[in-house]
Amino acid sequence: MNAFLFEARIPRVVFGAGALQHLVREIDAMGSTRALVLSTPEQSADAERVAGILGSRAVGVFPRATMHVPIELAREARLEASRLGADCAVAIGGGSTTGLGKAIALESGLPILSIPTTYAGSEMTPIYGVTDNGVKQTGRDARVLPRTVIYDPELTLGLPIRMTVSSGLNAIAHAAESLYAHDGNPVIGLMAEEGIRAIGAALTPLQANPADLVARSDALYGAWLCGAVLGAVSMGLHHKLCHTLGGAFNLPHAELHTVILPHALAYNSARASQAMERIARALGVSSAPRGLFDLAERSGLPVSLAALGMPREGIELAADMAVKNPYPNPRPLERDAIRVLLEHAYDGVRPS
């Protein structure tokens, strides 16, 4: 076995159907008394429900989170938290809402309690991202790692099936890249493979019955593991491309992961054959890139960048940006090869 470094940095996790009932207990355990509740506009009713549970412990609701965390919105949210005298942020929703909480925490140090309603996994990481003038800047900082995460599968029952699958594939992307990370280790590998298996196994019954609470629990469990590995090791080409394309063209986050993942894995497959075998085994397919592409296509999800609204002329810019700053990846970053990858992803070509 090769030498490795393992360091655990994970939040307190409260998991189970009905776990939202423990919200007040968990806020008290954090030592907080003045919570600002965050959500997207679409989940403002959920935010109001959370504020109602908190009662006097809630000082306001900020229902304006949006994908890729525009820097102007982050500033406004920080000012609102300061104006209200908030001593913590409670983020209910997906990665956009957790991301806004992180943007607040990065400057203010406010602790975050996250209540995920998708499978994004951001709640388990010290990774933040903000978008300024079409460029998404990401980084790692211990201040943005949520203090506590409440995983309540009942809160995912209303997640539309297309979003369920795309969010699940987003989570699988985290685990897939961790399996060939240069700083990976055996513990992370076990968590990643189990996370992929749990989500993959849950998606089929959920497509038949989106209200299957057992499958919802399995998917959320898998998302927890996939998010944890995202926060523990470095990501490669897939995540770089998604951050580049998402920030530059304002493309939907989960669907973008769905489109890019099969092609990024195909690009790396010759240099990461063991990782590809583990991903395929966890999903019960013969080929990881083709298996993930086929799953998305069967589920009626977009499988091309064109379908997401990206302009074809953006391919050259994206290829330039993808190789601008070196980062670890199993296969060397070759601009022409990445341009071909992007062309295939743009046209929705099934990986060979």
Swiss-Prot record:
Pathway where this protein functions: Xenobiotic degradation; (2,4,5-trichlorophenoxy)acetate degradation
Key words of the record: Aromatic hydrocarbons catabolism, NAD, Oxidoreductase
One of the Pfam families matching this protein, by short name: ADH_Fe_C
GO biological process, one term: 2,4,5-trichlorophenoxyacetic acid catabolic process
Gene3D superfamilies with a match to the protein in the record: 3.40.50.1970, Dehydroquinate synthase-like - alpha domain
UniProt catalytic activity: 3-oxoadipate + NAD(+) = maleylacetate + NADH + H(+); 3-oxoadipate + NADP(+) = maleylacetate + NADPH + H(+)
Catalytic activity, EC: 1.3.1.32
Catalytic class of the enzyme: oxidoreductase
GO molecular function terms noted in the UniProt entry: alcohol dehydrogenase (NAD+) activity; maleylacetate reductase activity; metal ion binding
Claim: Membrane is one of the keywords in the record: no
InterPro entries per record: ADH_Fe/GldA, ADH_Fe_C, Alcohol_dehydrogenase_Fe, MAR
The family this protein is said to belong to: Belongs to the iron-containing alcohol dehydrogenase family.
Protein name: Maleylacetate reductase
Originating species: Burkholderia cepacia (Pseudomonas cepacia)
Gene that specifies this protein: tftE
